[in-house]
C-alpha cells in the first residue's frame, strides 16, 4: 500500500492507495473517523481486483486542518484527490458523513463516478419532513452519550469487546486537534436525488440509531437506481461491526456495475 499526500492550498491530505490496474474504489470515512477505520475493507476489496484508495479529510488523522478562512468543500477535496491520482471514473463508498461528501460529489460530478455506495448515513438531506424525522431519532442528550453507544450497535458491543476497544482507539486518534466543518456544494434535496442517474447501493445496520432501515427506504424512494441492503446485528458502523456481510454486499454490487478491464486512468498512478 502506497502512503501519499494530495497537495492543496495551505494543506495536504493523507491517503493510502493499494495501486494496481483494477477499477478504483475510493473510501470516505465517517465524521468521527479517518482512513484508518477502513482496515476491514481495504484488503478484501483489493483481493477482489480493485484499486482501493482511502483518505483522511481535513483535520483527520494524517491530514492538515488547513486555513479556517478557506475550508473548501469535502466534494472539492475529493475531486482534487481523484485528479491527483489520475482517476477519470471510480466507485465512491462513503459511510455516515463520508456518504454526504460522496453524494455532494455525485451531484457536482456524476460523470466522474461509476457507482455510489452510501452506508449508515443521514445523507445531509435538507427537506423539512426529513429533518423532523431526524430530530425524532436523536432526542436531546443523544450527543452526550458515549461514542460507542451512538456509533456501534448493542450486538457488537455485547459480543466483541476487543473490537470495541480497537474502534475506540482509532476514533480517539482520528481527530488529533481542532475540527473543521466544511460546507456542501449542493443542496441535497429530494429533487436533487431524483435527478441522479447513478447506480446507488444503500446499506445500513438494523440497529443504526442515526439511519435505521426506514430512513434508507425513504432515500430509496427518491433515488432512481437504488438498491438496499440491511446488515443484521449492526449499528451505525456496519463496515466495522459486520465486515464480512458488509464487504459481500458491496462486492456483489460492484461486480454488477460492468466488467472488463478498467480504462479510466487519466495518468499512471
Where in this protein do the model-derived segments appear?
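Conserved alpha/beta-hydrolase catalytic His-Asp/Glu region
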Residues: 126-128, 132, 140-195
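Catalytic active-site module of serine/aspartate enzymes centered on a nucleophile-bearing elbow/loop
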Residues: 226-269
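Flexible "cap/lid" loop of the alpha/beta hydrolase fold
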Residues: 103-108, 113-143
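Acidic catalytic loop of the alpha/beta-hydrolase fold
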Residues: 207-211
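Short beta-strand/loop motif that positions the catalytic acidic residue
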Residues: 196, 202-204
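Gly/Ala-rich beta-loop-alpha elbow adjacent to hydrolase catalytic centers
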Residues: 94, 98, 102
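Active-site loop/oxyanion-hole signature of alpha/beta-hydrolase fold enzymes
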Residues: 40-43, 47, 53-94, 248
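Conserved HGGG/HGGXW glycine-rich cap/lid loop of the alpha/beta-hydrolase fold
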Residues: 9-64
Amino acid at each position: 500500500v502506497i502512503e501519499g499526500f494530495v497537495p492543496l492550498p495551505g494543506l495536504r491530505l493523507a491517503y493510502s492507495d493499494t495501486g494496481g490496474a483494477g477499477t478504483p474504489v475510493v473510501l470516505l470515512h465517517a465524521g468521527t473517523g479517518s482512513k484508518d477505520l477502513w482496515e476491514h475493507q481495504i484488503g478484501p476489496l483489493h483481493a477482489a481486483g480493485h484499486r482501493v484508495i482511502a483518505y483522511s479529510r481535513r483535520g483527520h488523522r494524517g491530514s492538515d486542518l488547513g486555513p479556517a478562512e478557506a475550508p473548501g468543500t469535502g466534494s472539492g477535496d475529493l475531486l482534487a484527490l481523484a485528479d491527483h491520482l489520475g482517476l477519470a471514473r471510480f466507485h465512491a463508498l462513503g459511510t455516515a458523513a463520508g456518504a454526504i461528501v460522496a453524494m455532494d460529489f455525485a451531484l457536482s460530478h456524476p460523470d466522474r463516478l461509476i457507482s455510489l455506495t452510501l452506508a449508515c448515513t443521514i445523507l445531509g438531506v435538507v427537506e423539512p419532513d426529513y429533518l423532523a424525522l431526524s430530530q425524532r431519532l436523536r432526542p436531546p442528550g443523544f450527543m452526550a452519550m458515549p461514542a460507542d453507544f451512538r456509533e456501534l450497535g448493542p450486538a457488537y458491543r455485547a459480543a466483541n469487546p476487543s473490537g470495541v476497544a480497537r474502534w475506540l482507539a482509532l476514533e480517539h486518534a482520528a481527530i488529533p486537534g481542532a475540527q473543521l466543518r466544511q460546507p456542501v456544494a449542493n443542496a441535497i434535496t429530494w429533487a436533487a436525488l431524483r435527478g441522479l442517474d447513478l447506480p446507488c447501493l444503500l446499506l445500513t445496520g438494523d440497529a443504526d440509531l442515526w439511519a435505521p432501515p426506514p430512513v434508507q427506504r425513504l432515500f430509496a424512494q427518491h433515488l432512481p437506481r437504488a438498491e438496499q441492503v440491511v446488515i443484521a446485528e449492526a449499528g451505525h458502523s456496519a463496515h466495522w461491526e459486520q465486515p464480512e456481510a458488509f464487504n459481500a454486499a458491496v462486492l456483489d454490487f460492484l461486480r454488477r456495475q460492468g466488467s472488463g478491464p478498467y480504462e479510466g486512468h487519466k495518468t499512471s498512478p
